[in-house]
Amino acid sequence: MSLLCVRVKRAKFQGSPDKFNTYVTLKVQNVKSTTVAVRGDQPSWEQDFMFEISRLDLGLSVEVWNKGLIWDTMVGTVWIALKTIRQSDEEGPGEWSTLEAETLMKDDEICGTRNPTPHKILLDTRFELPFDIPEEEARYWTYKWEQINALGADNEYSSQEESQRKPLPTAAAQCSFEDPDSAVDDRDSDYRSETSNSFPPPYHTASQPNASVHQFPVPVRSPQQLLLQGSSRDSCNDSMQSYDLDYPERRAISPTSSSRYGSSCNVSQGSSQLSELDQYHEQDDDHRETDSIHSCHSSHSLSRDGQAGFGEQEKPLEVTGQAEKEAACEPKEMKEDATTHPPPDLVLQKDHFLGPQESFPEENASSPFTQARAHWIRAVTKVRLQLQEIPDDGDPSLPQWLPEGPAGGLYGIDSMPDLRRKKPLPLVSDLSLVQSRKAGITSAMATRTSLKDEELKSHVYKKTLQALIYPISCTTPHNFEVWTATTPTYCYECEGLLWGIARQGMRCSECGVKCHEKCQDLLNADCLQRAAEKSCKHGAEDRTQNIIMAMKDRMKIRERNKPEIFEVIRDVFTVNKAAHVQQMKTVKQSVLDGTSKWSAKITITVVCAQGLQAKDKTGSSDPYVTVQVSKTKKRTKTIFGNLNPVWEEKFHFECHNSSDRIKVRVWDEDDDIKSRVKQRLKRESDDFLGQTIIEVRTLSGEMDVWYNLEKRTDKSAVSGAIRLQISVEIKGEEKVAPYHVQYTCLHENLFHYLTDIQGSGGVRIPEARGDDAWKVYFDETAQEIVDEFAMRYGIESIYQAMTHFACLSSKYMCPGVPAVMSTLLANINAYYAHTTASTNVSASDRFAASNFGKERFVKLLDQLHNSLRIDLSTYRNNFPAGSPERLQDLKSTVDLLTSITFFRMKVQELQSPPRASQVVKDCVKACLNSTYEYIFNNCHDLYSRQYQLKQELPPEEQGPSIRNLDFWPKLITLIVSIIEEDKNSYTPVLNQFPQELNVGKVSAEVMWHLFAQDMKYALEEHEKDHLCKSADYMNLHFKVKWLHNEYVRDLPVLQGQVPEYPAWFEQFVLQWLDENEDVSLEFLRGALERDKKDGFQQTSEHALFSCSVVDVFTQLNQSFEIIRKLECPDPSILAHYMRRFAKTIGKVLMQYADILSKDFPAYCTKEKLPCILMNNVQQLRVQLEKMFEAMGGKELDLEAADSLKELQVKLNTVLDELSMVFGNSFQVRIDECVRQMADILGQVRGTGNASPDARASAAQDADSVLRPLMDFLDGNLTLFATVCEKTVLKRVLKELWRVVMNTMERMIVLPPLTDQTGTQLIFTAAKELSHLSKLKDHMVREETRNLTPKQCAVLDLALDTIKQYFHAGGNGLKKTFLEKSPDLQSLRYALSLYTQTTDTLIKTFVRSQTTQGSGVDDPVGEVSIQVDLFTHPGTGEHKVTVKVVAANDLKWQTAGMFRPFVEVTMVGPHQSDKKRKFTTKSKSNNWAPKYNETFHFLLGNEEGPESYELQICVKDYCFAREDRVLGLAVMPLRDVTAKGSCACWCPLGRKIHMDETGLTILRILSQRSNDEVAREFVKLKSESRSTEEGS
């Protein structure tokens, strides 16, 4: 769909001027339009028409018709083929065409004309280019149209020539955006006016009614764009609007070969570098590697970047008017051939990147790359190429702001970065180019044709002089007096009868006009002029002369007092002095002539009315209209029951008085009896619905005007408006424009003069106060001019306001203008939207009745809205943060946007216009997108400029790299500058929507979103190679974290979400932790070596541990502090870090403990050193607990917590082991002390009675006995209490207590319980009584071991003393521990056994040893036994009968005769006088002998059977030598007691098993060598299987 613009200018006819009253009709594609009718042989229409064209094979038919009384006749016609019409966005001078008499038809369609006539018509026809299309592109398309037209009927097209020419972006690409998810693709679709919505750009192949020419999507970066960023670019900045449009897919619209560049235009105003995005799209595979990019910021351009230049073979069309001025701003490079080749390295990079199997996707396919990945393609490719050529020379150096430190993976990490500048500097000062912007809407928006229409300007100049030389504001008021009529007289104003007998009304004493008292204020005509007119008509020459002289004097005074007014008028219309003087004379004379020589023909068409009052009971009215001019009155027909009637009735009047008024009144016709009676009594029987009084002097030319209906009196109920088409032919002024057009011409020219000529493009804002300050448009002189003109010719104040608003729209970016425009539009809104109780006309209908033109104003607002949106999309550039004035303009611009939204909602009554807050938010986001793109692409330069760095880097190293991370901190710094500027400068200004828009937060959100995409992909690339040091990654992590926490974390849109940035760095943090573990272990070894060299000195007098512990945990805490300061918000990732760090802690501490444990025995001979080393281990445990709490304590990850708890247990075990080793190191010295104690104890004599003397003596003896031990303990325990940590001290005390107790038991009371050698000697030596002497020798002076009761009492007292000593009044071991100590209990039990009889000990043995028989596990045979237990009922004595039945499966090897027999022994108390042992006969060489022998044991009645047991022993009888034991079994009689008898197979074990109690009893009994029962018992329980022969 294309837009055809036709301007019907003038015509020249042959013939008498009186016979022509012509109009022109235009026909194309079944659409017909008609001009107004104009008289004369050289009529001038100057009317514009627009048509939507979908078929270019048709033509435009132009017919000129002459109006007749009955029918119209055709003067001539002309047919113009649409293919021949030029393409242009500028109006041309037009072409004269000869009118022909006949038309030629073909297939029912006009195809040409014939038979020329002498008449000619001037037409300007053109196809309009898309709004704001770049000038170069306009030339290109115009050239293409001309080229196509030049081909003629053959319609051939040279594809070869086309392929050689540089293609331009498609126009469709500028007017639409195909992304269905775009946040901005429908910004204008729901509120565009009918006019703007019906003219789609001519380059679309299909109609796109919603395609807004000012849409600007968020930029989309593609890999193709980024590959081309290294190619040559020419950029040219110009002044007008531009947008940023990217195209993810190709648009198949261009008539050339497929366009390879999308229109990548800036959201920026012309001068912004912020949005100078190097984004290009390749769409032609043949040209991918050879074409270069030219980006041009062109006037009226939707596209700043990506515009390919023309080749020299394409001559641009002639540029006229505004285009010439702007073309002059273009650099010379624009005119050179832009077809260049990219550098070889770019081609190489592209080839390398694509690889043999890689290629870009099809043009219409979606890109496989994310936005962030695209940034990296070029950087990664370059570095990989360089890595292939240049060997890696080590890790890159840290950025200057990163301190290099020891322990590579640990130090040099800045965990608390603050990237904000100490002195904020607006980044826009660095990002903006020199501003050369021409403020205002593009020429297509605010075309002011009145500036070029000299004929109209000349007429307006005269009318302005006429209005100002004798202004209405200075007219002479009437001199009214109360007057009595003697004859029936009618009011001059309302034509009503002056009722009454006397004093009926008012009469002016000067001019004689009569009216009602209520009507005198409605008579505002000048009294002098009225008097002059009347005198002239009645021949009162003298009186007339006097009046004329008075008027002359007044005009002279006016000219003398206000010369500046007429000078301004002369300057505005550029009239030379001589002509001005002559014109002043002419104007004065016309004023003096008044209406005496004035006449006009007036044609009034009553078209329709809207919103009338309902007067009938039915809620409706039956309106008709009366029109009165002078004394002539006419009326329309009645429209019944309609409040929005349409009459379409035309009336003709002749008027000879310029001061006359046209009185248009609307009535409600009543046809009932009441109205008929009223007709008889009153002139006005019908109900009054409203009136409008039109001054004839305010009429000019053809007017189509809506007039608001007004009241006659305060009692009138009036509403609505009436539409009148008025045609006025004033004698001598037949061809002038309507006064509204004339006022527009005056206002626009005055505005142009004051701003562009006097103000050099700046708008002077008048100072005005009060409620009507918005009606003051200029300074005093200029304001008086427009006000007087408006007053004279009836221009409504709202029309003045809308006209001034339209003028300001072309300068809306000048300082102070947005505020004025906002106020103006707010008052315009109030005028239309704020209805009163007296009117029921909707705001939309009132606006539709505007004389300014509904479509015109709506289109103006639509275009202004788009332009404002564009400028807000580059607010950082257009409204610098460093300029308070521009910031105020920014605030006013948003207010203006809000007013436009209010207008659309309340005045246009659109259903859902875009909310101003959302529009501003979208604009802010668009600006931030382009800002980020720019700082990303120019990061090094901007950073160097902002921080005055002199570092020069080659272009390929300025961007992101996989060999270093220098780029990213710089980018973060720039991002922070942007966010800070938005937060501190723009947020306080853009505060109109506090609930919906916070610029600082939006800035942080957008910047973080874009940065996150790039950062994520960058780190994915780094993961592949890990070319940077882990400390560098950690530093970057901290900066990213700081950026997130400072600006992003609290954003509402991210509340409740787990940030994703920790996941980007997880692998690098784990890598750092791996390296840190190695560093920590190395550090540990070094710390221990240093500590060892220093002799493990205490760190201070109060600290009981050495430096190595402090060093180790200082290093671990530093490492953990880095992890902690990461403040990882992702619990799962933090858990990974904690698990890994827990492993490091475990390795380090366990290696420390292992090293100490290994060397510890060597240090035990020194006094303090072992204690310090144990203190070190204990301090490890203390610090580990603190670190556990620091890492989260109960909140710590379960796996990490378990690891640390397990480590704590291990360290506890280590400390126990070291304490044991340390305690055992005192064994030799304690042995010596205890030996001395034993000697002293052996000298104690006396009985163990309980007399006081005996107790005192025992206490003294105990002190004497303890002296050797106490001397030793005093010296050492005092040292330990000083040197050891409390926990270590207790462990050392426990070990010493253990050693002392065991040694006393072993050396004083019994052989040591754990001395298996001694036990074995007991077993072996007791095998036969003849060897007891060996046992005695081993136990050293057995007589001393057989402690007397006195000695036991002394020893018991000594134990109490030792216990109190180790308790140390609560500073040592706890009493509970000491009392329950198994060592003490064992010793005391042994002592208690010393005083018991042999029978008691044996009974205790039998009752306590329940598991003596262990042959079940490894039996060496079995014996069948039958036991019967009898208890005498009288005496209670027990008799046991034992029958040895047989033996079986005896395991024995012997070289000689094997003669097994069974020995049965009764073990128990009170057996000294009874037979205790029986033996069976031996059986020769029988391993399963049968005995069947019965034995009887008699037990006393002192004890029950549970105190006795049978011990069965199978032996091999040997003659002349000791019998050898095969196996033993024990049968407690307690098992037989319940049943009374038992028969079983008893397995034979190798020896008797007993616990410590049994061994103790055995040892005590072994010392009673004179007791036969004891000696026999020891021998019996000490027996074990003899060694077999041959084994």
UniProtKB/Swiss-Prot annotation:
Annotated spans, Disordered: 155-210, 230-350
Highest taxon above the source species: Eukaryota
Tissue: Expressed in kidney cortical epithelial cells and brain.
A Pfam family matched in the record: MUN
Boundaries of every C2 domain copy: 583-707, 1419-1546
SUPFAM superfamilies for the chain: C2 domain (Calcium/lipid-binding domain, CaLB) (SSF49562), Cysteine-rich domain (SSF57889)
Basic and acidic residues bias locations: 184-193, 278-294, 312-339
All residue ranges annotated as the MHD1 domain in the record: 1013-1156
Annotated keywords: Calcium, Cell membrane, Coiled coil, Cytoplasm, Exocytosis, Membrane, Metal-binding, Phosphoprotein, Repeat, Synapse, Zinc, Zinc-finger
Start and end residues of each MHD2 domain: 1263-1405
Presence of keyword Transmembrane: no
Binding site for Ca(2+) 1: 616, 622, 668, 670
Regions annotated as coiled coil: 1172-1202
Binding site residues for Ca(2+) 2: 616, 668, 670, 687
Cited function: Plays a role in vesicle maturation during exocytosis as a target of the diacylglycerol second messenger pathway. Is involved in neurotransmitter release by acting in synaptic vesicle priming prior to vesicle fusion and participates in the activity-depending refilling of readily releasable vesicle pool (RRP). Essential for synaptic vesicle maturation in a subset of excitatory/glutamatergic but not inhibitory/GABA-mediated synapses. In collaboration with UNC13A, facilitates neuronal dense core vesicles fusion as well as controls the location and efficiency of their synaptic release.
Subunit record text: Interacts with RIMS1.
Domain notes from UniProt: The C2 domains are not involved in calcium-dependent phospholipid binding.
Name the record gives this protein: Protein unc-13 homolog B
Organism of derivation: Homo sapiens
